[in-house]
């Protein structure tokens, strides 16, 4: 809840989304500090996914873990992408539940108050079978098979490199520049996504500090040339 993922290369799956918390109270903090500002139940949602590349690098079958104490089992998702947010509302869907022209009917709004918060999903690329959310705006969904998508971390004498063809697979796809104004405010603290010094974030530079230019592509690098450089 209150997460912003922007310009990442994600080869794994998002697990335990929407579960594992129950209606417990969880602390949130003062902006850029560690003091507790208040407590709030975890509703899930209020998440933002912009300009990421999702890759189904490994098989998508769920992981099954048997219980030690009984005959039950737990399942853990291994399907990459944002598909698990299909049933989460967009902001317009969520805000439409509230009528600000008259006093609130708390009994009528019980479901809205306990329901999931909205999500913002835009400009992501899905490769090798990674599945998009139906809420994704301007998504690239590739039909290239998992085995034909290459993402490997390679060690050489002078450091680590990324051996990948993802920038060939997303060639020609672009989205808008993301900044603090696009991300808005997290729901519960009502604070903007910003730099530690309180200034606005503008995602106009890539992993190496290279300017993204007017054609903004998803992922951590401004282009294929940058992706071929030594990482560290």
Which role does the model predict for each range below?
Residues 214-232:
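Short, surface-exposed, low-complexity cationic segments
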Residues 41, 149-220:
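C-terminal accessory segments
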Residues 1-176:
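Glycine- and acidic/polar-rich repeat regions and solenoidal domains
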């Amino acid at each position: 809840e209150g997460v912003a993922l922007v310009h990442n290369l994600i080869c794994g799956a998002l697990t335990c989304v929407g579960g594992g918390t129950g209606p417990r109270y969880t602390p949130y903090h003062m902006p850029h500090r560690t003091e507790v500002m208040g407590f709030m139940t975890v509703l899930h949602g209020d998440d933002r996914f912009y300009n990421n590349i999702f890759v189904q690098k490994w098989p998508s079958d769920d992981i099954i873990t048997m219980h030690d104490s009984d005959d039950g089992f737990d399942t853990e998702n291994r399907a990459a992408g944002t598909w698990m947010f299909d049933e989460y509302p967009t902001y317009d869907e969520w805000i439409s539940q509230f009528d600000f022209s008259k006093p609130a009917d708390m009994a009528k709004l019980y479901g809205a108050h306990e329901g999931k918060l909205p999500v913002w999903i835009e400009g992501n690329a899905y490769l090798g079978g990674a599945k998009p959310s139906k809420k994704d705006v301007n998504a690239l969904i590739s039909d290239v098979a998992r085995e034909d998508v290459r993402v490997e971390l390679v060690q050489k004498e002078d450091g680590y490199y990324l051996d990948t063809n993802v920038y060939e697979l997303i060639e020609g796809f672009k989205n808008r520049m993301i900044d603090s104004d696009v991300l808005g405010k997290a729901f519960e603290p009502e604070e903007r996504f910003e730099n530690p010094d309180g200034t606005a974030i503008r995602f106009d530079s890539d992993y190496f500090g290279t300017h993204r230019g007017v054609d903004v592509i998803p992922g951590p690098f401004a282009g294929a040339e940058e992706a071929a450089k030594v990482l560290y």
